Amino acid sequence: MSDNQDILAVIALTLPDGSVKTFPIGTTGNDVALSIGRKLAQDALALRVNGVAIDLSTPLTADAAIEIITFSSPAGQDIFWHSSSHLMAQAIEELYPGSKFGAGPSIEQGFYYDVASTHRFREEDLRKIEERMLEISKRDIQIRREEMSRTDAIEFFKTVRNDPYKVEILEDTLKEVERVSLYHQDGFTDLCIGPHIPSTSKVKAVLLSNISSSYWRGDSARENMQRIYGITFPSEKLLKEHVARLEEAKRRDHRKLGAELELFMLSPEVGSGLPIWLPKGAIIRNELETFLKEEQRKRGYLPVYTPHIGNIELYKRSGHYPYYSDSQFPPLTYHDEEGKQEQYLLKPMNCPHHHLIYSSKMRSYRDLPLRLTEFGTVYRHEQSGELNGLVRARGFTQDDSHIYCRPDQLVDEICSAIELTQFVFGTLGFSEVQTRLSMHDPENQAKYGGTAEVWEQAEKDVQEAADRMGIDYFIGVGEASFYGPKIDFIVRDALGRKWQLGTVQVDYVMPERFDLTYTGSDGQKHRPVVIHRAPFGSMERFIGVLIEHTAGNFPLWLAPVQAVVLPIAEDVLDYAKSVHQALLAAGIRAELDTRSEKIGKKIRDAEVSKIPCMIVIGQKEQESGEVSLRRHRIGDEGRFSVSGLIEKLKTEITGKS
């Protein structure tokens, strides 16, 4: 072989640390991992080449920047769990022949697969499937990718697999695609873009958690399916850690704590997904609303109120109907005295109503920005299987604001909305916040309102504002709303779970649909830009997340009961009552425990109720005109005069510490 041929047969691969290694053409990711170390090769799941993840078995033919993907990274977990959904499907097919499979994606914590089967799955079946998955894992089946034309794939899934769901995907969703990829593991084959783990043996621990109902393609008019959820790990140790987190999550479950702390209730007599706020929960919600209203007032927002229903024509004009019709309650049909028919919808969004408020009078460039705000209740007909206490409800209240501004004011207003959202999260103890710039998918322009040029400008403005605010963000292509790009704020709670809460969204589309205008300095009409903004997102969801984040241990300013007065004996009851009244008069939410229980029992009950301050009063306190302060989860803090205690607590409450 000549020197030139030797040079051509070598490729240079740049590793994450910047070092460069040369390998023969045709080297695979597995070869690279082995060259670095046996442990890395054991942990390797896939390879990232120039930013794109591929299978470890794929030959490399050109110079590239590469990275070995392991389970320790989000990308590795995504690949591992999606591969595990195929493993579960293979196990189900072996145990329950004739089962067919719909969608089987990875999710944030594991995976699921929608299964069409004559067998009605029960809890005990999950254990059988787990056992079979581990048995398949021990077979060490090499997972093999095959590419073929879409036409050949349709024939394969019709004749070999007899899988109508994959045929439908190929004939419908992928109709513009020429070639597709399949993944084989023994006798099981599935349609998938990949990549996948190299072998079933990578899966060492399995937990299938629950079964719910679903519909093919999420359409209630289509076939009913059974959705099986699970999670897998490359070691038993990781599974045990996961189970421990699940136990802690159960302890923090907002539905459990909501009942124990008497915050909210759900009743079948009212309807699924329609929470009722009890007095203590209403206090928390009111405190949060008051907090945000005060901050908005400082920033020039104007409050409005709008109805809970609206004429369907309003939502047709905005595009919310029929765009969101699958998640809306059916229209209410009304006939007036003359027989004329009108249809109304339970309000799916507040924004169309706010746009009408804007257009109710002529606006000048001097009037802008106009910032309208409302805690408006909206309604979505979520599927019953998706409902989850407060965090996924059918009726919920959004802290909705719409800012109408001139184009030259836009970036400043986005920055102001970002600052307010950051302030809200910081005040409420969410220190880990990710920011996603949710952009449109240019390959699917028909999904969005407005022109490509409008979207280009909107996304440029969003990114400029994020850069100006120094936000560390990532871009989510295809995550935008149909009328504009968004800045989504994703908080991480005390258990490490991620929740998408607040949002700031730019909208050039609705001003066109509602013909919103203002008179410029040139005397001509111009279009304003709209910013949709909601730091909480929805009050129900935010409070549900907050309950779990704090485990019900709310900060003093937010606690429904801020202090409880605990007299040690009946002979100090009159003094305890006077202390209680002094606290109430100072605006502190306080209770008085007059039960004839021992002080230890009263303290334990107050701890269980998660009351921040316990004010203990005995003979010594009465004689000195003082009180003893005990903090929830902390213990004794010493004795104070009544006025000194009140001043101390009010300072903490005002400072929201």
From Swiss-Prot:
Gene3D superfamilies: 3.10.20.30, 3.30.54.20, Anticodon-binding domain, Bira Bifunctional Protein, Domain 2, Threonyl-trna Synthetase, Chain A, domain 2
Reactions listed under catalytic activity: tRNA(Thr) + L-threonine + ATP = L-threonyl-tRNA(Thr) + AMP + diphosphate + H(+)
Protein name: Threonine--tRNA ligase
Chain segments carrying region Catalytic: 253-555
Name of the coding gene: thrS
Species: Pelodictyon phaeoclathratiforme (strain DSM 5477 / BU-1)
Function: Catalyzes the attachment of threonine to tRNA(Thr) in a two-step reaction: L-threonine is first activated by ATP to form Thr-AMP and then transferred to the acceptor end of tRNA(Thr). Also edits incorrectly charged L-seryl-tRNA(Thr).
Primary subcellular site in the record, as a coarse category: cytoplasm
Annotated GO MF terms: ATP binding; metal ion binding; threonine-tRNA ligase activity; tRNA binding
Assembly: Homodimer.
